[in-house]
Amino acid sequence: MELTYNGKKSKKEILETLPQSDFSKPVSEKENILINGDNLEALRILVHNSNLKGKVDLIYIDPPFATNGTFTISEERTSTISSSKKDEIAYTDNLLGEDFLEFLRERLILARELLSERGSIYLHIDYKIGHYVKIIMDEIFGAENFRNDITRIKCNPKNFSRRAYGNIKDLILFYSKTNNPIWNEPFVPFSEEDKARLYKKVD
């Protein structure tokens, strides 16, 4: 299955577009790096001008959700983004439809080049656009490499007043590059306090 839309570039064109800038020092897989800049250009640099291609085990992406909204942040609320009109603009989410899908597709194609053979990618998206994004990810990573749709509960529906079911979740699409991904069980050992609280009776 494939999504067809105006402005959809070939994979070859995306992969052959070279970065217009470069880092001042080589990028090594042995050290952490924070890139402040355009993420498409950063991905091109990492694919073409670093030694990280095919070496990244885990990618997590939290892109805009194609909401056509403006999101703000304030000094009092530094850890959350909202749609308040009185605070400083953090970002404008104005890419919609096919423009949004191609924006995301270009970045996912480059991200796949960075993944190791046992690498995985997690993409956080919402219920309105997520079903289109899954088809795009099936194209890029292969439907056979779709691992899970993880539900993220984001709010309590008790205050939801619209005449519809409450919008209480986002989804995280989990794909691997091959059929043999690295997998670590997502468990945390009980602390001694947990054991005392949860298991009060001894056999």
Regions found by a protein language model. Name each.
Residues 1-203:
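Core catalytic lobe of class I
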